[in-house]
Every structure is written in C-alpha cells, then in structure tokens.
C-alpha cells in the first residue's frame, strides 16, 4: 500500500508544480501587459507630440510665407504704377513734341505761300487765295511766261520778237540786261506793278492747264488773253493744243 500512496503524492506534487508554473506564467503575462500599457501610453503621447511639432513649425512658417507673398504683390503693384506713370509722361511729351513740329511746319508753309503771293500778279486787296489756288495760279503764271519766251525766241525771227509778240504796254515789263543799280529790284515786282501782269485766276479761267484737269468745265477762251498775241498762234502751236 505504501507504494501507491507515494506515487499519488508524487503525482500531486507534479500537478501542483505544473499549476504553479501555469499561475506563474499567467501572472507574468498580466505583469507584462501592465508593464506594456504605460510604455504604450508614453509612446503614444510621444508620437503625436512628434507629429504635432512639424505642424506647429509649419503653422509658424505660414505667416512668414504670406507676408513674403504680400510684399511681392506690393512691389509688383508699385512697379506697375511707376511704369504706367512713366508711359503716360512719355506719351504726353511725344504728343507735345509732335504738336510743336506740326505747328512749325504750318508756320513755314504759310510763310512760303505768302512769299509766293507777293511775287504773283496783283489782285484786289480783299482777294485772298487759298493754298491750292495759290499753287495753281503760280504754276499757270510760270508756264505762261515760259511759253511766251520760248515762242518769242523760236517762232518769230529778228531781235524784236518779244516786243512784237507782247503788247506795247507790256514791253517795259520785259527783263533787260542786269545793271548794278537795279540789283535790288526783281522782275517779278515790276511785272506785278505793270498792267500786263493782270492774269486771270485758274478758278475764273477753266481752260487753264491745272483747272482743266481738276474741274469738268467745257472749252473756254484762251489761257492768257494778251491783247497783242495773234489769234491763230494758240491754235497752230503744238504746245497750246492740249489746252484748247
């Protein structure tokens, strides 16, 4: 009988030792969990803190970036305002210079036309020729004088060809040999003061070269009706045929 009792006691001891080891292992697991919980809590707190640190630093950097952007925008706006003001001043100065040039040009043109009117045959005092009328009349006047001199030299033989071509009252108007006493007097002024220089205006005489091109008038009289000019000379001379 003693042998079975010993075996039972040994079995009980083994079982108790096994249960103690199980309890010890269970206790150790609980202790491990209890130990791990504070560690996890501390690590969880540290991780958000670490994550929140960049957000705080980024939040601190955002106002600085906004300030820089605002400063850049302000600078751009100032540059635009300055450039617009500069462009406005440049345009104004260019406009003023252009107006001055145009004013000077018109003054010079009017002075030249006045000088041209002074050498043309005289009109009544109340007559005022426009610019285009002055130019046409000067063209016709020069053309008539040139044709008269050319026909006098080529068409009629003899030394007194010009005197026979022009009327007697216009003979003193012809230019003579230059003399030192008459250097200050021009032939144009003498022609303007003489009665032979009363030439019709291109507007009043539609058969003039320039008026025939610009106006649709019918055929009129001769261009310059000199009293001593032969009537058939204007019709037989080739240079006068286009102006009939």
From Swiss-Prot:
Q: Recorded GO terms, molecular function? A: chromatin binding; DNA binding; DNA-binding transcription factor activity, RNA polymerase II-specific; E-box binding; protein homodimerization activity; sequence-specific double-stranded DNA binding
Record has Cell inner membrane as a keyword: no
Cellular compartments per GO CC = neuronal cell body; nucleus; perikaryon
Q: Which superkingdom heads the taxonomic lineage of this protein's source?
A: Eukaryota
What Pfam family is a match for this entry?
Answer: HLH
Coiled-coil segments = none
What tissue specificity does the UniProt entry give? Expression restricted to the embryonic nervous system.
Q: Which InterPro entries match?
A: bHLH_dom, bHLH_transcription_factors, HLH_DNA-bd_sf
Which keywords accompany this UniProt record?
Activator, Developmental protein, Differentiation, DNA-binding, Neurogenesis, Nucleus, Transcription, Transcription regulation
- Which GO BP terms, alphabetically? auditory behavior; axon development; cell fate commitment; cochlea development; cochlea morphogenesis; craniofacial suture morphogenesis; exit from mitosis; forebrain development
Report residue spans for region: Disordered.
43-84
Domain bHLH, by residue range, is 93-145
Q: Where in the cell is it found?
A: Nucleus
Query: Quick one: where is this thing mainly located?
Result: nucleus
Q: What does this protein do?
A: Acts as a transcriptional regulator. Involved in the initiation of neuronal differentiation. Activates transcription by binding to the E box (5'-CANNTG-3'). Associates with chromatin to enhancer regulatory elements in genes encoding key transcriptional regulators of neurogenesis.
Q: How does it assemble?
A: Efficient DNA binding requires dimerization with another bHLH protein.
Q: What is this protein called?
A: Neurogenin-1
Source organism per entry reads Rattus norvegicus
């Amino acid at each position: 009988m003693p042998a079975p009792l010993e075996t039972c006691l040994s079995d009980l001891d083994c079982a108790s030792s096994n249960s103690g080891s199980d309890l010890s292992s269970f206790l150790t697991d609980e202790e491990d969990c209890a130990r791990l919980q504070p560690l996890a809590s501390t690590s969880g707190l540290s991780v958000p803190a670490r994550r929140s640190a960049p957000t705080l630093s980024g939040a601190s950097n955002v106002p600085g970036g906004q300030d820089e952007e605002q400063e850049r925008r302000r600078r751009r706006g100032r540059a635009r305002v300055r450039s617009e003001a500069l462009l406005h001043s440049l345009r104004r100065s260019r406009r003023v210079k252009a107006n001055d040039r145009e004013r000077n040009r018109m003054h010079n043109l009017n002075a030249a036309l006045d000088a041209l009117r002074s050498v043309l045959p005289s009109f009544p005092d109340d007559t005022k020729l426009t610019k285009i009328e002055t130019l046409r009349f000067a063209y016709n006047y020069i053309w008539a004088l040139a044709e008269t001199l050319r026909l006098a030299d080529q068409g009629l033989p003899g030394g007194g060809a010009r005197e026979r071509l022009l009327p007697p009252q216009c003979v003193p108007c012809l230019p003579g040999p230059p003399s030192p006493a008459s250097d200050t007097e021009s032939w144009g002024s003498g022609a303007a003061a003489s009665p032979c220089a009363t030439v019709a205006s291109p507007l009043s005489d539609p058969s003039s070269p320039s008026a025939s091109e610009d106006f649709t008038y019918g055929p009129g009289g001769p261009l310059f009706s000199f009293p001593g000019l032969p009537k058939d000379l204007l019709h037989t001379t080739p240079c006068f045929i286009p102006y009939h």
